[in-house]
Amino acid sequence: MSRLLRVYVDGPHGLGKTTAASALASERGDAIYLPEPMSYWSGAGEDDLVARVYTAQHRMDRGEIDAREAAGVVLGAQLTMSTPYVALNGLIAPHIGEEPSPGNATPPDLILIFDRHPIASLLCYPLARYLTRCLPIESVLSLIALIPPTPPGTNLILGTAPAEDHLSRLVARGRPGELPDARMLRAIRYVYALLANTVKYLQSGGSWRADLGSEPPRLPLAPPEIGDPNNPGGHNTLLALIHGAGATRGCAAMTSWTLDLLADRLRSMNMFTVDYSAPPEACVAQMRNLLPSMQCTVTPKPESHRAVADAALAFMREMSNCK
């Protein structure tokens, strides 16, 4: 049996998480870095998936297409973008095992550093597009329902940077297909801040049914920055945002079932934060210093270590040869 550490580095695009995560993996002989499947996203269809989403938003804003047509494009793109993550998650799930007993500080034999978790394409970015009026809440609920169960030892690193610095970084990187959209950036920062609040709320024993279920829906307050130590109430979470949006569309039962599923998926995640306003090497150091606090798992079978490593390497290989 071996020890496996899984680290999911996630957050709004343009923060510098990819630079830090890949640098952390490259300095360790026991780590595999799994990048965003950009080659898959650019080869799965007639055009780049990222460009497809931004173009749909831009054309809808200009009145060239209506909201229904834009939603169809965005829903299809988000679903396709989630496929590599969800498929890999299902492949390695039988080999993850359980967390060791408390106090056992044996270091991991293998570290997987993922550039994003499935919730990015099935929860966070769809909700941001809902806020920019490019995706109806019914479509968001459909995607949330596809979020896979959270295995033991799921470590999620979120992070933030000042809004003005974030926008300038996004403009400077000039990723193909990506448009510098300040409104979308505000929306995705808002969603990830609410995500951090949601995990804290659930892990403190919060129940959306008790705190939100009997009250009129309302939009969450402006959330604090990710990493705020205060414990948020239920009204300042993704659960409140989705609860309010679903209730206004007359789909209360479906919304409730989906919120139960989402709470189950998020409650057991081990969440950490990085301050990306620091220089790149300092961001790497922050991630490095977080590793000893993370939860690993003990693989259930002798062959599990090799199966997980082979799957990770195949992910990297296939994602770069899918056009």
Curated annotation (Swiss-Prot):
The active site is at 36 (proton acceptor). Pfam families: Herpes_TK. ATP binds at residues 11-18, 169. Keywords: ATP-binding, DNA synthesis, Early protein, Kinase, Nucleotide-binding, Transferase. Its EC number is 2.7.1.21. InterPro entries: Herpes_TK (IPR001889), P-loop_NTPase (IPR027417). It is an enzyme of class 2 (transferase). Homodimer. Catalyzes the transfer of the gamma-phospho group of ATP to thymidine to generate dTMP in the salvage pathway of pyrimidine synthesis. The dTMP serves as a substrate for DNA polymerase during viral DNA replication. Allows the virus to be reactivated and to grow in non-proliferative cells lacking a high concentration of phosphorylated nucleic acid precursors. Belongs to the herpesviridae thymidine kinase family. This is Thymidine kinase. It comes from Bovine herpesvirus 2 (strain BHM-1).
